């Protein structure tokens, strides 16, 4: 019986994701807790194998069937809108989407609509949708990283980005103008695999659901 393939995100959420999968009994020692060079890992005892990819690529692996399941942030799903099933909020790596501006600048003036502001972000679709909902026209500047530097160097007036502690904002003399959305890690599934491999995927999803519940109880104890 072929293993279930799960796509995992590189970077910040990787270590927490490995801990989560090990705690659920879906990954063995082959999947190392520290991100290394290996991008494809098999765990025979658990009947799983893992593709380790950029977070923005995880939904693509799942949507096109290269992976049966994937774990990725809600922020990525909201931006890309992939054709996958979102099965479960895993509850960890929680962060906030915020609109931020340089400290000392009146945000009401920036958002008055009298002039077209430039907004730097890694999430252009979501950013444009937000400003459209407020009836404001902005110029969205897409960046892959270092979003917080954009106002300092005159590239943008505002930024939209995800934050956990807000430390990077403070280090770059930025303040939160508004909290837009929240995000956490989600379990997604390929639509065909979810139906055709239900006898394998179903119990795995149930293990993860039970772990989410146990963690929630422990957090509130």
UniProtKB/Swiss-Prot annotation:
Tagged with keyword Plastid: no
Superkingdom assignment: Bacteria
Subunit structure comment from the entry: Heteromultimer composed of HisG and HisZ subunits.
Keywords: Amino-acid biosynthesis, ATP-binding, Cytoplasm, Glycosyltransferase, Histidine biosynthesis, Nucleotide-binding, Transferase
Matching InterPro entries: ATP_PRibTrfase_cat, ATP_PRibTrfase_CS, ATP_PRibTrfase_HisG, ATP_PRibTrfase_HisG_short
UniProt subcellular location: Cytoplasm
GO MF annotations, alphabetized: ATP binding; ATP phosphoribosyltransferase activity
UniProt xrefs under Gene3D superfamilies: Periplasmic binding protein-like II
Source organism phylogeny: Bacteria, Bacillati, Bacillota, Clostridia, Eubacteriales
Domain notes: Lacks the C-terminal regulatory region which is replaced by HisZ.
Pathway: Amino-acid biosynthesis; L-histidine biosynthesis; L-histidine from 5-phospho-alpha-D-ribose 1-diphosphate: step 1/9
SUPFAM superfamilies per record: Periplasmic binding protein-like II
EC number, as in UniProt: 2.4.2.17
Organism: Symbiobacterium thermophilum (strain DSM 24528 / JCM 14929 / IAM 14863 / T)
Gene: hisG
Protein name (Swiss-Prot/TrEMBL): ATP phosphoribosyltransferase
Top enzyme class: transferase
Record GO biological process: L-histidine biosynthetic process
Catalytic activity: 1-(5-phospho-beta-D-ribosyl)-ATP + diphosphate = 5-phospho-alpha-D-ribose 1-diphosphate + ATP
